[in-house]
């Protein structure tokens, strides 16, 4: 409860809301529980907002990309294949230190692709710190995976 009281998501949520409504295509990325959040929210974005949403959760796609390009580059390769004009990439990393998510952030920076990040744990985590041109950069101050992932899901559901 204390974590939620100090969540302070309003400013970053309004930035996210603006980005969400000004992009037709959305790619949502995350590992583990964050990938589950991506899967769930992608359905709502498609159903309620008619957004074109892509996520990397298909086992055969994941194993092909990891086998051919390594796990650290698999999600970046997914972006290379799926990013189109008017795409917003949402990068989630509970701890903000996932190399594969950091590679996606750097790819977005280099290729001028609009993106935003959702992180937790340490306030000065690598992804949060390197998200120079992020349209939104929300951090939840908690070291609990469950709290971070649930708050990220609440944040993303704010437009539903």
Label each residue range with its predicted role.
Residues 3-23:
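A short, well-structured juxtamembrane/interface segment
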Residues 1-3, 152:
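Charged, low-complexity, helix-prone segments enriched in Lys/Glu/Asp/Gln
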Residues 27-160:
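Glycine-rich phosphate-binding loops that contact phosphosugars or nucleotide phosphates
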